[in-house]
UniProtKB/Swiss-Prot annotation:
The keyword Methyltransferase applies. Pfam families: Methyltransf_5. S-adenosyl-L-methionine binds at residues 52-54, 71, 98, 130, 137. InterPro entries: RsmH, SAM-dep_MeTrfase_MraW_recog, SAM-dependent_MTases_sf. One of its GO terms (molecular function) is rRNA (cytosine-N4-)-methyltransferase activity. The gene is rsmH. Specifically methylates the N4 position of cytidine in position 1402 (C1402) of 16S rRNA. One of its GO terms (biological process) is rRNA base methylation. One of its GO terms (cellular component) is cytoplasm. This is Ribosomal RNA small subunit methyltransferase H. It is an enzyme of class 2 (transferase). Keywords: Cytoplasm, Methyltransferase, rRNA processing, S-adenosyl-L-methionine, Transferase. It comes from Corynebacterium diphtheriae (strain ATCC 700971 / NCTC 13129 / Biotype gravis). Its EC number is 2.1.1.199. It comes from the Bacteria.
Length: 339
């Protein structure tokens, strides 16, 4: 992925095939050492439960371990619970934004839930965060994530709370719209698009995706449309990130999950665009670097890093994995281990 390039995975439901979890075997391999060593005390957090594919693979691969699945999307959570009911009390599904899981765990532990209690007492053995929008959400056209299907401009991962994409389009100032399009979508025509949105919403508020896509076709120059992919791709990504506060959630969850890892426990993050990957990389570098003041002849224990990066740079999917699952084409994987 080049610098600033947005997510290659299409928001086009016609291009997304099934619900095969990205790099499932590699994810299991990365968290395996401590999960295997902990046996029945191992608790894995699947921070982005979605359709439950990664959780199912973990429950099958580690027959003694238990899994806590987090999702802010009530539809995804209900579907995953049904899919994973064969695993009984080895699986616990929690409705929450992933950076707000800690208070939920504490509440459940206090009420006697054994998985939550073990997670707090023993620490987390492995954690996975598969960032971005899920295949299930893309397949539900009425959610407004996919740009080739006319639908309400919602885009909320948790459709019970928060602002919608329509709210953003109809209420944000020109400057705010231009900022999110440029920052979150790397859209080179951000200012021009923002001007068109403000002009058109004065005639009639935006409420469906087809009207927005039509505006983008009319606003983005033909030469760019011919070579730059679908003209709606960057704008839809930017709106989705803004509506769901995705980067804020990611920045918040990094310290939340790493401080709860047991010694030897690992946290793995799968990013699909450069903004996410930069946040993960920067945090991992910070917590895995010695804080010993320069000039001292030895490493002082109190300044020694408490984590080590497991992956060499950002791992990418193989051609075989991409063929099986097109979503893997732009994935970047980073993992860290508690020392």
């Amino acid at each position: 992925m080049t610098h600033g390039e947005p997510q290659e995975f299409s928001f086009d439901v016609e291009e997304n095939h099934g619900h095969v979890p990205v790099l499932r075997a590699r994810m299991a391999e990365l968290i395996a050492p401590k999960v295997t060593a902990m046996g029945s005390d191992a608790v894995i957090i699947d921070g982005t439960l979605g359709a439950g594919g990664h959780s199912k693979y973990f429950l099958e691969s580690f027959p003694e371990a238990r899994v806590i699945g987090l999702d802010r999307d009530t539809n995804s959570l209900a579907s995953a619970r049904e899919r994973l009911k064969e695993f009984g009390d080895r699986f616990l599904g929690i409705h929450t934004r992933f950076d707000r899981f800690a208070p939920k765990l504490e509440e459940l532990a206090q009420s006697g839930n054994p998985i939550a209690a073990t997670a707090l007492e023993q620490g987390i053995s492995g954690a996975l965060f598969d960032l971005g929008v899920s295949s299930m959400q893309l397949d539900q056209a009425e959610r407004g994530f996919a740009y080739r299907v006319d639908a309400p401009l919602d885009m909320r991962m948790d459709n019970t709370i928060g602002i919608t994409a329509a709210d953003v389009l109809n209420t944000y100032s020109h400057g705010e719209l231009a900022r999110i399009l440029k920052t979150y979508g790397d859209e080179r025509f951000a200012g021009k698009i923002a001007s068109a949105i403000v002009r058109e919403r004065e005639k009639e508020p935006f409420d469906t995706s087809a009207r927005l896509v039509e505006l983008l076709y009319a606003t983005i120059p033909a030469a760019t449309r011919r070579t730059g992919g679908h003209p709606a791709k960057r704008t839809f990504q930017a709106l989705r990130i803004e509506v769901n506060r995705e980067l804020e959630s990611l920045e918040n969850v990094l310290p939340e999950i790493t401080q709860r890892l047991t010694t030897g426990g690992r946290a793995v993050f799968m990013s699909y665009q450069s903004l996410e990957d930069k946040i993960v990389k920067r945090y991992f570098v910070d917590i895995s670097t010695s804080k010993t003041p320069p000039g001292l002849p030895m490493e002082l224990p109190e300044y020694a890093p408490k984590f080590k990066v497991v992956t060499r740079g950002a791992e990418k999917a193989t051609d075989a994995e991409i063929e099986e699952n097109p979503r893997a084409a732009s994935v970047r994987v980073r993992a860290i281990e508690a020392l």
